């Protein structure tokens, strides 16, 4: 069955795998999903990810990160801008949870965090928030 919102599918797969305490999860490949995975890796929310090319279609295998007591590094991950209600924010985007969490934006500079958007003076579509 085709997915109408690939970003929500990406978020849901990661959230569900974290709640089920899975070490890895497989996500259908797209360049956008690869860029979001790279950003989550850079910010320390996931352990690693690899792009696996199979005969039928490529996938992204995400290795989830857990603390010493077994809690997921991702406490909350929520879609903000949806197909029915797009959310855009300017270069003066506010901090999520006073800077403890991140907004992930799609801007003219690529997939960036709210902190990077403020530093570069750009805005964009707020894809999701993560804490």
UniProtKB/Swiss-Prot annotation:
An annotated Gene Ontology molecular function: structural constituent of ribosome
Protein role: One of the primary rRNA binding proteins, it binds directly to 16S rRNA central domain where it helps coordinate assembly of the platform of the 30S subunit.
Keywords, sorted A to Z: Ribonucleoprotein, Ribosomal protein, RNA-binding, rRNA-binding
Organism (species): Chlorobium phaeobacteroides (strain DSM 266 / SMG 266 / 2430)
GO terms of biological process kind: translation
Cellular component terms (Gene Ontology): ribonucleoprotein complex; ribosome
Stretches of the chain forming a coiled coil according to its record: none
Name of this chain's protein: Small ribosomal subunit protein uS8
PROSITE patterns: RIBOSOMAL_S8
Subunit structure: Part of the 30S ribosomal subunit. Contacts proteins S5 and S12.
Family: Belongs to the universal ribosomal protein uS8 family.
Pfam families: Ribosomal_S8
């Amino acid at each position: 069955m085709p997915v109408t919102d690939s970003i929500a599918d990406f978020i849901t797969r990661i959230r569900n795998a974290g709640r089920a305490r899975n070490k890895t999860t497989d996500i259908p490949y797209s360049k956008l999903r690869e860029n979001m995975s790279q950003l989550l890796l850079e910010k320390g929310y996931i352990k690693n990810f690899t792009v696996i090319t199979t005969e039928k279609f490529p996938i992204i295998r995400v290795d989830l990160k857990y603390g010493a007591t077994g809690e997921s590094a991702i406490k909350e991950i929520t879609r903000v801008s949806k197909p029915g209600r797009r959310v855009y924010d300017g270069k003066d985007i506010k901090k999520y949870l006073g800077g403890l969490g991140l907004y992930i934006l799609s801007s003219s500079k690529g997939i960036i965090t709210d902190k990077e958007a403020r530093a570069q003076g750009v805005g964009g579509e707020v894809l999701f928030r993560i804490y």
